[in-house]
Design a protein with these regions (language model features):
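Mature, function-bearing regions of proteins
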Residues: 1-299
Length: 299
């Protein structure tokens, strides 16, 4: 996917978010979702007429919802990568994020995929927001970075009052190739939180991807009109359920001094043919039991 090839189109995805807590009590939920998959370098060269960007609309995208709040979120991402010594992310940059609907958006987690000119992955940035208005990014890079490979990072950012700020995230990203301008595909992101060597939280977002069309936008507004508005409500609703299950509330720590923390090198031998495979099968999802309200409990 060369940066100067034919511009790629914005995509929209429809799927499901899933979450399961394993200890000290079990708690699980799943909700339908829609999301955007935006080729930001292509959109910089040729804006998409269907995408309502940085303007009022029932369904759209606002750059200021990401990064440091500037009007060009791609410029922020490029500066972040340059500051971290990643100089070869010269291909497409895809942003997987929740849309802004009817003027509202809360984005617990977004995923930035920065490619080289030959289409390989140079870096993945996991951008996490909490309900206190704070934001932190986990940068995943290094030799062997690829779809389908298990990646990891130490948890340093507070998200849930029912989870301590410790442990390790295990990430696995799967996505079909979107190099063709009008290609459909599938994506799946799985995130596990391990504490003291045992899994505590299992989350995922997966779904089908298709070109962003006016018909697809109408379908999203018709089937999920209140999706972005109820994300925060669902977070508090499930927090109440956990409190009723007698889970102790953990005080909010001071946020990390650095806005970006680096993950570990990809796990050797953890890649598979799933690197470009569609989202997990029902059996795979059942085995992992992931879910999240776009993952506020990326906790």
């Amino acid at each position: 996917m060369p940066a100067q090839g034919a511009p790629l189109r914005a995509r929209i995805g429809f799927g499901e978010v899933r979450h399961k807590r394993l200890a000290p009590v079990e708690h699980a939920f799943a909700y339908p979702t829609c999301f955007l998959m935006l080729p930001l370098r292509s959109l910089r060269r040729q804006p998409d007429a269907v995408l309502a960007r940085n303007r009022r609309a029932p369904f759209g995208f606002r750059d200021a919802d990401h990064g440091d709040g500037r009007a060009d979120s791609l410029a922020w991402l490029e500066e972040l990568l340059a500051g971290e010594g990643i100089a070869d992310a010269d291909g497409e940059v895809w942003l997987h994020c929740i849309p802004r609907m009817f003027g509202f958006a809360f984005k617990p987690v977004s995923f930035w995929y920065a490619h080289r000119a030959d289409g390989t992955l140079a870096a993945i940035v996991v951008e996490v927001n909490n309900t206190f208005g704070e934001r932190h990014c986990y940068l995943l890079a290094g030799d062997g970075l690829d779809f389908g490979r298990m990646l990891s990072a130490a948890k340093v950012f507070h998200v849930s009052p029912f989870c301590e700020t410790r442990g390790d995230y295990a990430f696995r990203f799967m996505r079909t190739d979107l190099a063709a301008r009008d290609e459909c595909g599938r994506t799946a992101v799985r995130v596990e939180l391990h504490v003291d060597g045992s899994p505590l939280l299992l989350t995922s977002v997966s779904g089908r991807i298709e070109p962003l069309t006016r018909g697809a936008v109408r379908f999203a507004l018709w089937t999920l009109p209140a999706m972005t508005a109820v994300i925060v409500a669902r977070i508090h609703w499930h927090a109440l359920k956990l409190w009723l299950k007698k889970l102790p509330i953990i005080g909010k720590p001071v946020p990390p001094e650095l806005a970006v923390s680096r993950g570990r090198a990809p796990t050797a031998g953890a890649t598979s043919a799933a690197s470009t495979r569609p989202s997990p099968t029902r059996a795979e999802r059942g085995a992992v039991e992931n879910t999240a309200s776009p993952a506020q409990d990326l906790a």
